[in-house]
């Protein structure tokens, strides 16, 4: 099978690492920009926003399957363009990607189909959002409706803080993403991430994880795209997983089909485990980053037949994905100044030495400059390890982190605690 992978982050490096292991793989191409992926796949020098160029590349190189990693191309409708050219795509089309692209769309869908989630109000102006605060106690959650790189959610401890967040969002702090706002009740409980793979009709569980969003130890500082993760999510028991499938995930897939926008790809449910049971915080229309990294470390099934079956409506014929009983832990090394203004250009060495204990270092915000590896983004490296015991996996990951020489980097010391 000839495969094209779209995306250049740590998530895509983990996907590439797993795809490259598949016996079903013939030729593997990936978009350029990640030195780690470049070791595994041939370069596809294409601009992802130029859909015609992507289609042409697929036709010229007899691509059997396109795997889209990040959310932006999904929401931009790249899947639609490829499907229109009869190219199999793993990832939803533009309409179905609204599950991530518009928080208001998802909340309305939940309300219509009785999918458990927090009480909310959609607001189309700062005035409307500020007035909506009268209907909520603090803390209250203020969300930008659109894509904001994992940073468009503010938990406001006071009304003043909530009004400031509303003001910032409507003034363009997250670009067009904040033109509409969702005001939401704050849910008490523990967070967990639940993943499912769907072909638009059939849906199967695809592992669980827990990520750490805040930049600092002890869950302090601003939200980020994620500073680390572990899998499985220990609080998600088999009974809870069954409830999540029955009460949240399966009804969503059925609802999307009924709405005429079948969801193909990975459905990532961000959950709050409340005293009343699991409730949906939000959906993502793709694998999480860095949750993908821990899931790929644990996935035992050959990934390509799964992705291709989902892309071609044949998931029913595939056996359930199997995951190792081992634990996996990812620690993100970020550039100083992240998330506000990460310092670029820092030199990174000793990655091979870091992997000597069995850890895998997935590259994210990196670039090669005359064979010297340098930081080129906020989240730079994702150091991932697996072991039969949770603490052993954690120790292996941190041992590898401490071997890497990257003076401009920092990380949280409490991932998994």
Swiss-Prot record:
Nucleotide-binding recorded as keyword: yes
GO biological-process terms attached to the record: 'de novo' IMP biosynthetic process; purine nucleobase biosynthetic process
Protein's pathway: Purine metabolism; IMP biosynthesis via de novo pathway; N(1)-(5-phospho-D-ribosyl)glycinamide from 5-phospho-alpha-D-ribose 1-diphosphate: step 2/2
Residues reported in the UniProt entry to bind Mg(2+): 282, 284
Domain ATP-grasp: 107-312
Catalysed conversion reaction: 5-phospho-beta-D-ribosylamine + glycine + ATP = N(1)-(5-phospho-beta-D-ribosyl)glycinamide + ADP + phosphate + H(+)
UniProt-listed Gene3D superfamilies: 3.40.50.20, ATP-grasp fold, A domain (3.30.1490.20), ATP-grasp fold, B domain (3.30.470.20), Phosphoribosylglycinamide synthetase, C-terminal domain (3.90.600.10)
Superkingdom in the source lineage: Bacteria
SMART domains listed in its UniProt record: GARS_A, GARS_C
UniProt keyword list: ATP-binding, Ligase, Magnesium, Manganese, Metal-binding, Nucleotide-binding, Purine biosynthesis
E.C. number(s) listed in UniProt: 6.3.4.13
EC main group: ligase
Binding site for ATP: 133-193
CC cofactor note: Binds 1 Mg(2+) or Mn(2+) ion per subunit.
NCBIfam families, per the entry: purD
Name used for this protein in its record: Phosphoribosylamine--glycine ligase
Source organism: Zymomonas mobilis subsp. mobilis (strain ATCC 31821 / ZM4 / CP4)
Organism ancestry: Bacteria, Pseudomonadati, Pseudomonadota, Alphaproteobacteria, Sphingomonadales
């Amino acid at each position: 099978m000839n495969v094209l992978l779209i995306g250049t982050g740590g998530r895509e490096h983990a996907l590439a690492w797993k795809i490259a292991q598949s016996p079903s793989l013939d030729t593997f191409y990936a978009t350029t920009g990640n030195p780690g992926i470049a070791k595994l796949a041939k370069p596809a020098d294409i601009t992802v926003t130029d859909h015609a160029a992507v289609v042409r590349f697929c036709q010229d190189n007899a691509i059997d399957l396109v795997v889209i990693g990040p959310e932006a191309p999904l929401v931009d409708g790249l899947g639609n363009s490829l499907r229109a050219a009869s190219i199999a795509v793993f990832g939803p089309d533009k309409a179905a990607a609204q599950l991530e692209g518009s928080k208001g769309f998802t909340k309305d869908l939940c309300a219509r189909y009785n999918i458990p989630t927090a009480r909310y109000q959609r607001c189309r102006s700062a005035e409307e959002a500020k007035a909506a605060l009268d209907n909520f106690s603090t803390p209250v959650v203020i969300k930008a409706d659109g894509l904001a790189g994992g940073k468009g959610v503010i938990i406001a401890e006071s009304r003043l803080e909530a009004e400031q967040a509303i003001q910032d969002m409507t003034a363009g702090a997250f670009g067009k993403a904040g033109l509409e706002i969702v005001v939401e009740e704050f849910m008490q409980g523990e967070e967990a991430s639940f993943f499912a793979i769907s072909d638009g009709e059939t849906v199967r569980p695809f592992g669980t994880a827990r990520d750490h969003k805040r930049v600092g130890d002890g869950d302090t500082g601003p939200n980020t795209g994620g500073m680390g993760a572990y899998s499985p999510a220990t609080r998600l028991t088999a009974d809870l997983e069954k409830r999540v499938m029955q009460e949240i995930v399966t009804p969503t897939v059925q609802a999307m089909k009924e709405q005429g926008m079948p969801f193909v790809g990975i459905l990532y449910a961000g959950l709050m485990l409340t005293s009343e049971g699991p409730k949906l915080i939000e959906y993502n229309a793709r694998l999480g980053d860095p949750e993908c990294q821990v899931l790929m470390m644990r996935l035992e099934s050959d990934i390509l037949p799964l992705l291709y079956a989902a892309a071609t409506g044949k998931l029913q014929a595939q056996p359930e994905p199997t995951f190792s009983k081992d634990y996996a832990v990812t620690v993100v090394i970020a550039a100083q100044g992240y998330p506000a203004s990460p310092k670029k250009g820092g030199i990174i060495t000793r990655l091979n030495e870091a992997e000597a204990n069995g850890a895998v270092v997935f590259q994210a915000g990196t670039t090669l400059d005359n064979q010297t590896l340098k930081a080129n983004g906020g989240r730079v490296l994702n150091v991932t390890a697996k072991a039969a015991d949770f603490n052993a996996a954690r120790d292996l990951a941190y041992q590898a982190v401490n071997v890497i020489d990257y003076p401009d980097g920092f990380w949280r010391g409490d991932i998994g605690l």
